[in-house]
Amino acid sequence: MTEFWLISAPGEKTCQQTWEKLMAATTKNNNLSTNAKFNIPDLKVGTLDVLVGLSDELAKLDAFVEGAVKKVAQYMADVLEDSRDKVQENLLANGVDLVTYITRFQWDMAKYPIKQSLKNISEIIAKGVTQIDNDLKARASAYNNLKGNLQNLERKNAGSLITRSLAEIVKKDDFVLDSEYLITLLVVVPKNNYTDWMKEYETLSEMVVPRSSNVLSEDQDSYLCNVTLFRKAVDDFRHKARENKFVVRDFQYNEEEMKADKEEMNRLSTDKKKQFGPLVRWLKVNFSEAFIAWIHVKALRVFVESVLRYGLPVNFQAMLLQPNKKTMKKLREVLNDLYKHLDSSAASIIDAPMDIPGLNLSQQEYYPYVYYKIDCNLLEFK
């Protein structure tokens, strides 16, 4: 996906002039970035004290909302499992791809009325995204439990004859059932030792029924064989079998239990399919909601920081740059040259973290212009 730089600079004689200067410096001869105006409406400014406090709160809100957006995106990838290549086409904002949404950003007046104070708007965003985050935790927990239980049952029916469930392999006819004296055991015999088994099983212990062993199934390494003997000889037979590298499985033929396991697996599989569609729909809708909220937080941050940096009356142009990956360093230099007059202390510093009291810029690059990164690379594929 894509990285954007959301910047602002004060209006020259007009904001259009600021825009034209940026375009001339970054696109005319050197193709350093693809640019778009970033439309921020006339928001209520409030007092300077409120703006300084809000700057800090918005930084925290930005990190929280970005985290929520990434969690929804990542969970979408987890839920789609084998269709992970389809994840990107499901990550939309207002029905369009993320790049289109950001480059054509329009403030959502219905969701975030600009008659409200900046603090109120930030609280509306925080409340909405907190709800999404909480709902995601609950839905993910329920679906993960269901998926985990199903995987555990599926795992039982996979693997080698030594470990897997034998319920799907054996039939009633393979056993002597309801006998007071006789019992049928299931034995895993390595293929290399099968000849030895056929020669020796009748004499491994006393009271083995002659010619009672048949091959019921096989995998790459072993055969599954049955053998019938007297109940009182079972312990001795197990011991001797182990000495000869034959593994006696703990298995009792119980039709009701086997039927219940099968029904449970079918139920879990059906439940998973039933929940899958609504869950993916919920993720799509709420990814869009969270992403839209995130870009509105970025807009709020640009507005607040621009007023704090450039003063009143409000007069700045917000601009969205999509840097050319190969020329990012050059773009930084060009922007620095273009705007270094805005802050003499930053003129010699490019990409150097600084603490500026009153402005929330610690742990972040400081430039003479307002700058926020928007990274649309929201997925971490394992």
Curated annotation (Swiss-Prot):
User: Subunit arrangement?
Assistant: V-ATPase is a heteromultimeric enzyme made up of two complexes: the ATP-hydrolytic V1 complex and the proton translocation V0 complex. The V1 complex consists of three catalytic AB heterodimers that form a heterohexamer, three peripheral stalks each consisting of EG heterodimers, one central rotor including subunits D and F, and the regulatory subunits C and H. The proton translocation complex V0 consists of the proton transport subunit a, a ring of proteolipid subunits c9c'', rotary subunit d, subunits e and f, and two accessory subunits.
Report the family membership: Belongs to the V-ATPase C subunit family.
- Indicate where the modification N-acetylthreonine is found in the sequence: 2
In its UniProt entry, what is this protein called? V-type proton ATPase subunit C 1
**Cited InterPro entries:** ATPase_V1-cplx_csu, Vac_ATP_synth_c_sf
Its annotated function is as follows: Subunit of the V1 complex of vacuolar(H+)-ATPase (V-ATPase), a multisubunit enzyme composed of a peripheral complex (V1) that hydrolyzes ATP and a membrane integral complex (V0) that translocates protons. V-ATPase is responsible for acidifying and maintaining the pH of intracellular compartments and in some cell types, is targeted to the plasma membrane, where it is responsible for acidifying the extracellular environment. Subunit C is necessary for the assembly of the catalytic sector of the enzyme and is likely to have a specific function in its catalytic activity.
Task: Name the Pfam families for this protein.
Answer: V-ATPase_C
Of the GO CC terms on this record, one is: lysosomal membrane
PANTHER family to which the protein is assigned, alphabetical: V-TYPE PROTON ATPASE SUBUNIT C (PTHR10137), V-TYPE PROTON ATPASE SUBUNIT C 1 (PTHR10137:SF5)
Membrane-spanning residues where?
Answer: none
Q: Which UniProt keywords apply?
A: Acetylation, Hydrogen ion transport, Ion transport, Transport
Q: Which GO terms describe its molecular function?
A: proton-transporting ATPase activity, rotational mechanism
